[in-house]
Structure formats: structure tokens, C-alpha cells
């Protein structure tokens, strides 16, 4: 894959967090309201998806409710992934298909039955205080070792 430059300049704290998140299977970041958690997580997930050597890796940004995820993260996904040649967006499914076959989807935790059993390579849990406590052990812990982030008010890493 050619060298891709995403227009994201992490703040000093975000640079530290990116390095630390890569060292652990699960990460929890407790940060203030305007710390840039969503932008950081979206870009971390984008990098992971683009560099994952697996065939068609799958990543999820999980919000308490799907419309909330659309409001908080979808525009950022389009902003940053839109700079990658060959990227396609499915507005109705809130899905970003990257040129290497990787996929990032926004899901809501309100229907926990619908997200059980899906195979993920990475997941960001947003606003975890508003997500049922059973979601993490049933969904994230069964995700392969690659990456899960919890952000409080919000990031989880599988």
C-alpha cells in the first residue's frame, strides 16, 4: 500500500496515549470533555485498520446508541478516511470501506443481541458509562488480540 498521509496532528497527550494503547490488549482512557478522545480513537483505529495484515479486518466504533455514534464520530471518520484514495462510505450502514479491505462501522449498543458474536479486529467503546456492563465481556473480550479501547467518558482496546 502506498504511503498515506492523514491530516491528523495529535496533541502531546494523544501522542503518549497512541504509544501506550499499542502496548496493551485493553486500554481505558479517562479524559476530560474536550480532550479529543473521539478524534484520537478514530485515527488510531484508521491506522490499525490500514496496517492490519489480515484479510478484510473489521473494526467498530460502539456508542450507547447508533444515532449518538453517527453524531459524534461519523463526520470524523469521513473527514480523515476520506483522504485515503479508494475509500468508500456507506451512509445507511455508517460504514467505511478502506482500499485494503478493512472496514470500520459505527454501531449502537442499544441492541446488544445484534452485536454478539461478530468477529472484530478492534473496537472503540464510546461513552462506556452509558453502555450495558454485559457488552464488554460478551463482545470485546472475545475479539482477537488486536485491539479494544474504552473511553471514559470514553476508550476500549481488544
Spans of model-derived segments:
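Phosphate/NTP-binding elements of NTP-utilizing enzymes
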Residues: 1-152, 157
Amino acid at each position: 500500500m502506498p504511503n498515506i498521509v492523514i491530516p491528523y496532528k495529535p496533541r502531546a497527550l494523544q501522542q503518549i496515549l497512541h504509544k501506550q494503547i499499542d502496548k496493551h490488549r485493553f486500554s481505558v482512557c479517562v479524559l476530560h470533555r474536550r480532550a479529543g478522545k473521539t478524534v484520537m480513537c478514530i485515527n488510531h483505529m484508521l491506522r490499525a485498520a490500514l496496517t492490519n495484515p489480515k484479510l478484510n479486518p473489521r473494526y467498530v466504533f460502539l456508542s450507547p446508541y447508533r444515532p449518538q455514534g453517527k453524531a459524534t464520530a461519523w463526520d470524523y471518520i469521513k473527514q480523515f478516511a476520506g483522504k485515503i484514495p479508494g475509500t468508500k462510505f456507506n451512509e445507511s450502514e455508517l460504514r467505511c470501506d478502506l482500499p485494503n479491505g478493512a472496514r470500520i462501522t459505527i454501531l449502537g449498543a442499544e441492541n446488544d443481541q445484534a452485536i454478539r458474536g461478530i468477529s472484530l479486529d478492534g473496537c472503540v467503546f464510546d461513552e462506556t458509562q452509558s453502555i450495558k456492563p454485559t457488552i464488554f465481556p460478551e463482545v470485546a473480550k472475545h475479539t482477537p488480540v488486536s485491539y479494544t479501547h474504552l473511553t471514559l467518558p470514553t476508550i476500549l482496546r481488544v
